């Protein structure tokens, strides 16, 4: 139910025989070692970490893999690519992998709604990967979230995180959500918006860049920290790593090493060029993309999207919880108490 869903996943076509790993789950996955054929990696503690395969979600993990930060901290890490964040959580709960990196909304729904016994201990993303954008032909008439009353807004699906986030933004702006019509467009959202078949849409990159070039107006860019502060009240906890609760004590040295590796990757990516950032991603995930443009997009958003450290921001996490309640994705009164473990890196 997040932006890291099946429609945005770019699963690399490598070693797909590992599907059996998932104990019958209907997930198409791939596994790539953190550092191929190096003695340091071979001697390290082997771990499997699943994530949703969305490009912007995975940048810190791919930098940790390709630049050797996992190996530096004694980990022989395999990144397991799943079709969406829900699949990554299922793999974790089913003991198919050791860790799952997902958006908080996925982890929170699994924890609050179905009782998944997991703990999040590190964060690698602090903003949602969404922007609320007008169609080019409505840019002059729709200038704020309040102006969405009486308009049609395209989302990937009702109940998905883009829908929930829009409802939360409407509430924050004092707009009447009952006066807004939602259209579910799935993967056809970009073209429908560009052609003016709907008034407004909730998009990701590179759709945001393409629409801007076409003359669309950006009402809220959730990938911009200043916009998030203005419209959401601050950062909005996103990607983070979870482990099975019953194993966190046994794995504590490994968990600490993992947080250090990811922390080093977060620092490193801030100094990398766009070309270097794009090159850190597996070629199988970037086939058909303009790598120069992709690198530019990552470099443009990195200071906002990725935190300086892996420490958990509980205020940012509460904003996500409030958006899920506003969208009806978790029950009012449901608590995230116990989901976050701030003892590893603080919070």
Q: What is each stretch, according to the model?
A:
Residues 248-329:
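Secondary-structure end/capping motifs
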Residues 3-4, 41-185, 199-205, 220-222:
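Short, glycine-/small- and polar/acidic-enriched structural segments
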Residues 59, 126-132, 216-217, 237-241, ...:
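Small-molecule pocket liners
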Residues 35-37:
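N-terminal signal peptide c-region/cleavage motif recognized by signal peptidases
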Residues 318-347:
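Conserved C-terminal helix/tail region of periplasmic/extracytoplasmic solute-binding proteins
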